[in-house]
């Protein structure tokens, strides 16, 4: 038996623009920082608190205020929830349904956000296991999220493929010893942002263009 692990935001559902806007608004509310869109995409996969620390360190370079971090994380979650539902990328449900292997989701987002989106769009039995940012102590690029998924799938690293859309996710899969492909979808990132972590032939425009690769992998 083989397995495929999917990132959620930007791979399965078109939720990244809402994440980006929520981070921009919440950070601006408590600091004078204007967070660039690409910065969020490049750091996608980090757990929420780790991402805020990265933002403060990158833009201010000063000591991290734990209280401010908690306020930003809470406010970001509030703003994100106001966006309501998110559309699944075209073909995703059909493509995954046709894969005859184990399927998992690994996301740096909170358990509440992940389960709400998955249950709303896929149902609660569509994936064999789901690992969220609340389930682990270290987020991507640390291999822990993927190693936890391997454990829950009862599979070895060489039996699994990861589908990502962010450089940190690709790095995390490599650190876990798992092969990986990228589906860009509507990310502002390009091959230049991935060239240090993954070969060009493993980068696809979207899930539809990766369909044949995924089917061959499962077979």
Regions found by a protein language model. Name each.
Residues 18, 43-47, 87-91, 109-110, ...:
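Short beta->alpha linker loops
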Residues 1-39, 175:
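Active-site neighborhood of HAD-like aspartate-dependent phosphohydrolases
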Residues 1-2, 110-111, 115-219:
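Asp-based, Mg2+/Mn2+-dependent phosphohydrolase catalytic module
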Residues 56-94:
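Metal-dependent phosphoesterase signature
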Residues 20, 24, 45-53, 73, ...:
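An amphipathic alpha-helix signature
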Residues 26-27, 47-64, 117, 150:
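Helix-loop "lid/cap" segments that line or gate small-molecule binding pockets
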Residues 81-105, 111, 115:
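Short, acidic loop-to-helix structural element flanking the phosphoryl-transfer center
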Residues 12, 88, 103, 162-163:
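Conserved SAM-binding loop
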């Amino acid at each position: 038996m083989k397995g495929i692990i999917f990132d959620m935001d930007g791979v399965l559902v078109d939720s990244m623009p809402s994440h980006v806007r929520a981070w921009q608004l919440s950070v601006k509310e408590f600091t004078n920082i204007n967070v660039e869109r690409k910065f969020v995409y490049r750091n996608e996969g980090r757990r929420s608190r780790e991402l805020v620390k990265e933002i403060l360190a990158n833009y201010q370079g000063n000591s991290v205020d734990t209280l401010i971090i908690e306020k930003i994380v809470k406010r970001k979650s509030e703003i994100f929830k106001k966006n309501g539902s998110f559309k699944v990328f075209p073909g995703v449900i059909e493509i995954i349904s046709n894969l005859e292997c184990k399927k998992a989701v690994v996301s740096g987002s909170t358990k509440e956000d992940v389960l709400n989106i998955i249950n709303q769009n896929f149902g609660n039995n569509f994936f064999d296991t789901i690992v969220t940012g609340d389930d682990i102590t270290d987020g991507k690029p640390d291999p822990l999220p993927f190693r936890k998924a391997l454990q829950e799938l009862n599979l070895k690293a060489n039996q699994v493929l990861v589908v990502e859309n962010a450089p940190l996710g690709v790095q995390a899969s490599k650190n876990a010893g798992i092969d990986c492909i990228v589906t860009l979808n509507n990310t502002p990132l390009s091959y230049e942002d991935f060239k240090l972590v993954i070969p060009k032939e493993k980068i696809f425009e979207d899930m539809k263009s990766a369909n044949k690769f995924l089917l061959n992998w499962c077979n």
